Amino acid sequence: MMEAAMIIRRMEEELRSDYQIELVEASTPQIHKALSNAVMYAISDNWRKARREHEHVRRAYYFSAEYLMGRMVFNNLYCLGILDQIRDLLRARGCDIASMEDIEDAALGNGGLGRLAACFLDSAATHDLPLDGYGLRYKFGLFKQSFKNGYQCEKADDWQRYGDPWSRRRDDKTVEITFADQKVMAVPYDMPIVGYGTDNIGTLRLWQSEPLEEFDFNLFNEQEYDLAVREKNKVEDITRVLYPNDSTYEGKRLRLKQQYFLSSASLQDIIRRYKRVRGNDLSNFAAHCAIQLNDTHPTVSIPELVRLLMNEGMDFDAAFDITRKTFSYTNHTIMSEALEKWDYDLFRSVVPELADIISRINEVQNSELKARGVSQEQIDRMQIATGGQIHMARLAVFASTYVNGVAQIHSDILRHDLFKDWYSVTPDKFQNKTNGITQRRWLGLCNRELSEFITERIGGGFITDLSEISKLKQHMSDADIAAFNTVKQQKKAQLSAVIREKEGVHIPPEFVFDVQVKRMHEYKRQLLNALSIMDIYYSIKDGSLTDFTPTAFIFGAKAAPGYIRAKSIIKYINEVANLINSDPDMKDKMRVVFVQNYNCSYAEHIMPAADISEQISPAGTEASGTGNMKFMLNGTVTLGTYDGANIEIAQEAGEENNYIFGARVEELNAIRDTYNPREIYDGEPRVKRVMDTLVNGTVSDGGTGKFAEIYNSILNGESWHRPDNYFLLKDFMPYMEAKLRANHDYRDRIAFGRKCLMNTASAGKFSSDRTIAEYARELWHIDSVK
């Protein structure tokens, strides 16, 4: 184990050399930087050794537009086994390590896609797998969210303003990226991924876009000050923010440049590594390298690898043969708008060579399908480049060795619906890899109290082998449950204090904590939750609901800046919160709070404190979800639909220990073309009452018409979607029944606590350790280096 005292001594030396101060004089950012640098120094030998070990074996690379790493200082100290010692040593010197909770998360992701990537890297490092990640070093990430008059406001998330001590700039590994209209430098920053209980350390390499020439001195001398830095700004725009708004032509070009920048830089780097160890013959490249595409964002890597191999002297056929043996593709969505398509002319204007290569790949697919006797009608449905568009998901499916979904129901939809044409031709290509989470961050680190409760009963083996947690099923006595409930109450009190400090809202810890935290999207149905809260509110007010257990409804979500309806839903939820929180009749019955700037670190407070986890997307829309797993692991029941990993959670923990409701995917598919939500609206007074709050002045959108637009989208639809596209009214009454049943069951603290603890005890399947082992064994064919 690394010596904590040595790290503290080096930290104090850093403070003296960098700032000429002692620890007691240092600010939180100064302490964080010095401590981080001391840890980076302490792990440097192991990091270097791990890089060398990985070089000489078959290895895998993870390409992702997002990585939600969370606060790294606590996680790294925890994985090194010295968090408690460092905390004690700092406390003895008058410093509280908890002050570092004010340090910004690295703004490198948005939702589950990025957090999954981070969990995978953690699991791979912990289990000594040769996996490295590649991503982008966004200057401002997505955005920092706040609310003004109930509306979401976005501002730049300047997470690097106090430095970035967990990254190391590698100028010697810089590569050049060529677009049709500019050349830029991709400068790598390396971030260590510290494995738990091992000397193995993985690497996340993040690319930053910089100009070939920092500054046009001649233009500046001619007093053309803006022009002197214009090119620098254009280049830096490429990695300025995550997911640039693509509602305009220029926004689309920038987003494509971002994706190509990630792909080309990473592939050039991998080829360089390969040649350094194995020489210039790239014919065995696929035998030594596996690359996983995390969704469609890095799919442009496929034609780019072909281009790079052709530049090394290969012909197209040889280059493409190697390429399709190298890549695998993880699909994360069945939403048509998220299955990326690029206008062909726009694509050609950015990377013309790749447009030609994609056309050739399309020809290969056509000829192979014809040789297999596939009908022309089916071939037409499978075109990669057609109708003036390039379909990136189709490209990824055809040109990858394996394609996987991320929950069993999702993988079934891929096989039998979304990609059924490909599945009919190459069924062995398709796999399921149910998502997972790292129990080290999402239990060991964020819920020390529950982790200690478990360790006292079954030992600590679950930290590296979550299947061990099933032993907890033998510890379900009333006394065990009472002790578990005490832990849960501690976490609720802690979250209550955090929310009071950050949001200015008091939520009594003795209330039920009913939580929905996730990306804001119509299909995730935060609006359904809000309408249900209004139904409860009205039912309490009119006396028809007399046995309601006092509840705090907690929301957290960011809406994409250009997603107008999602932002309107945020406004509606905040208006509902204002209505209820200001009503004296509700003081001891209900609270509603929408936390601002929900992120990984906020989640670490919320997940352990929740009593009820809302996972309410309509069946067949959520690929998997990982928030549902984090809640489950922390002893929270799921109030959810037959969707994504909810199904597998209910299978593992038992439906009797969760609250599953709503139409199945088969039923929704059968009624999709004939479903009329107005029949429900007209026939169910409770539905009409809550729907009318959008238009009758109960809550106000300031006369903007935004709430009326939501109302009309549900009852009448729009040109681009059917009425009630996500079946809010269809599922409303079953949802209310399940929600109120869970609320009522909470009163029996032992019985409800047993449901919660049974979820924790049944969470073994949902470790990213299990998921990453399956990827390693069945997709990448890589082995542990230990």
Q: Each PLM stretch: what is its role?
A:
Residues 1-786:
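A conserved ligand/cofactor-binding region detector
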